[in-house]
Amino acid sequence: MAYFPPPLKQIKDGVNPSNITCSERLELVLKQSNGEPACLKPSSVSILIERGWAIHVLPDYTTENNNSEIFPSGQYEIETKRVSYFDESQGFLAKPSTAGNFPAVVMIHELWGLNENIEEMAEKLASHGYIVLAVDLYKNQVGTTSEEARQLVTAFDSKVGVENMNSAVSYLKTEYSVESIGSIGWCFGGGQSLNLAINNSDLDATVMYYGQVSSDSEKLSNISWPLLGIFAEKDQGITVSSVKQFELQLNDLGITNEIIIYPGVDHAFANPSGDRYAPEESQDAWQKTVSFFNNNLK
C-alpha cells in the first residue's frame, strides 16, 4: 500500500489542498472548525459531514463552462438587480420583466460563494416564471481556489446563515407579496437549503443537490411541504446509505419527497468547474427541478 505524508505536511510542502493525496482507501475532507485537511475512512467522512464537522474538497473553480448554457430558457424575458436584504449581504435578484403574480425561490450558492454561475442559474430559473433571490452567505466574498473556499466556509457561521436565509424569505414576501416560496442549493448550498427548511415554517418546496442530509427526526419534523433531493451514487461524503436513511426518515414523518440517486456520478456532478461534471445528468436533474417547482409552487 502506497504511503503519502499527512495532509498538513503536504500543504507545508506547497501542495494545493485540492491536490492532496491520501493513502489508499482514505478520503480527503476539510475540518469545519479550522479548515485543516484530513484523510479519513469513507464511513467516518459521511458521519462527519452529516454532523457538520467536515466538508468536501473540490478542485479550483473555473469559468470555462457554466450550467446555464445547456438548459433551455423559459418563456419569460427577465430583469436583474442587486438587493440588500440582510446586514452586509447583497443578493442577486432575477425576475420576469413582465407584470404578474410569480412564486419565489431562495437560491443558495455552493462553497465558492455567490459567483457568476449561480447568478446565471438564477436567471435561468427566473425565465420559467419565478422571482429568484440568490443569497450571499459570505458577505460579498467569492472564492476561486480550493484554499479561498476553505477559508470562506471555515469562517461561515451557520446560525447567522439561517438568519440570512430567513431574511431572504421575508424580503421576498414583503417586497413582492409572493404566495408561495421554495429554496434550492447545491453542495454546501444543498445542505443550507435543508437547513433553511428545518428552521423556517414559511416554505412550500425544498430542493437540495448532494447537500448534507440529516437523520434527526425532531429537526426534520418541521418540514410540512414536498422535498426533492438530488444525489450521486459515487459520493463518499453524502453516501447512498446516508441518503437512504434520510429518505426513510422523511417517509416515516409523512413528508412528501422525491429522492433521486444518479448512478455512476460523484459529488458535485452538476458543477461545471471540475472533472466530476456530468452534463447529461445535470440536465436531467434540472428538468426535474423545474417540474418540481412548477408542481408545488404554481
Pin down the residues of each PLM region.
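Short alpha-helix in the alpha/beta-hydrolase fold that links the catalytic acid
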Residues: M121, T239-Q249
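Gly/Ala-rich beta-loop-alpha elbow adjacent to hydrolase catalytic centers
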Residues: G185-G189, S193
